[in-house]
Amino acid sequence: MTVDLREEKELAQQRFKEICKHAKIVDTHNDFPYLLRVQLRNKLQLAEFDFENGLTSHTDLVKMRQGQVGVQFFSCFIECKNPNYLYQDFDTPTTVVRDTLEQIDVTRRLVCKYNNDLKFVDCADDAIAAFRNNGKIAIALGVEGLHQVDTSLAVLRQYYSLGVRYITLTHNCDNPFATAASSITGGLPDRGLSAYGIECIFEMNRLGMMVDLSHVSHRTMHDALDVTKAPVIFSHSSAYTLTEHERNVRDDVLERLKTNGGVVQVNFYQDFIRKPGSDRATIDDAADHILHIIKVAGWEHVGLGSDFDGIPQGPKGLEDVSKYPDLICKIIERTNATNEQIEGLMGLNVLRVWKKTELVALQLSKKLEPIESSWSGRKWEFYSYAKEFPELFPDAYKLNEKSTVWNYDQPLNIEK
């Protein structure tokens, strides 16, 4: 390394250190709770689980402090039910809601267990305070796919009441709301957003739930941008122009973020950021994706969504959560960015989206009632004896005959 390059690097580090006196890192996607599920069955009291002093995962408290993390969104992720990532029989009962609740529970218990260092946040102002202060790390919740609401907007509302503040419209499967990027990769048609999906976005806007467009198809991105009243996020996606993968964001969508106000949080997964022909992605590849998004959309529309602990390994130079400072310093070295622009990249951009989403909800909630629609393909099954109970009003039982299945001929048995 030449003297000039060494000095440039040292200056970037000094500047980052100064910025960190009043700004921290916000990461919108980390799958650490999934490791707790698949490896520990969500048991946090095991002696071997030493989150406070260091683990071999991408994430632990030591690495988070080293990485200058101020706000971390943990993903309450549960897989699509079909191992082939196809999701056509949407009305088959699953355990996905139970499993999602367990992930919300274990994340909140983690915060309680380490409450000297972590705190739970469910509003933008509290997250902004954590971003600005050198205190406890703020933990927020996201859900990675509307398959996890099991076709029900009522479940969506209950997730919000439990503190979930963004939901990804799809994971690696279609659902009644939207088309997934994985379906396009698999050769299936891009149907975009369904009519029910539009209603879902309106309900998310009404609640103050951020709309996450990572994992969705190209058409779904445009459809969502056409109807949402609030800015969107891409919680963990990168730039399609640099790495042509359906999980990434094309330039025509990046252009629309200037009007929508949304952000792309750059993902560190190898397949989404490495150069064609390269065996492994590097920290410079991640920086390239950040800079491309800035070039097309602007400094206000980019952030960090690593996908740590949901990917096998990080890029070279970005091996775990502790390495965020190296990436920010790389951007400082390669640009003439102002401190305000660097703060936006570090996390203020996505916190602005969160705050704007809350303000939109404040206005909509004054005018709109909760959306009571259900998926058109849903069958409501009841025991036949239910028809023996009093009607709420004449012919109430006939209102929903087309979607009702009376296929349980079990007699009413009331013990006196």
From Swiss-Prot:
What InterPro entries does the entry give?
Answer: Metal_Hydrolase, Pept_M19
- Residues recorded as binding Zn(2+) 1, renumbered to this chain, are 29, 31, 144
- Enzyme Commission code: 3.4.13.19
Its keywords, alphabetically, are: Aminopeptidase, Hydrolase, Metal-binding, Metalloprotease, Protease, Zinc
What catalytic reaction does the record list?
an L-aminoacyl-L-amino acid + H2O = 2 an L-alpha-amino acid
Q: Which PANTHER family match?
A: DIPEPTIDASE, MICROSOMAL DIPEPTIDASE
- Return the protein name: Uncharacterized dipeptidase C965.12
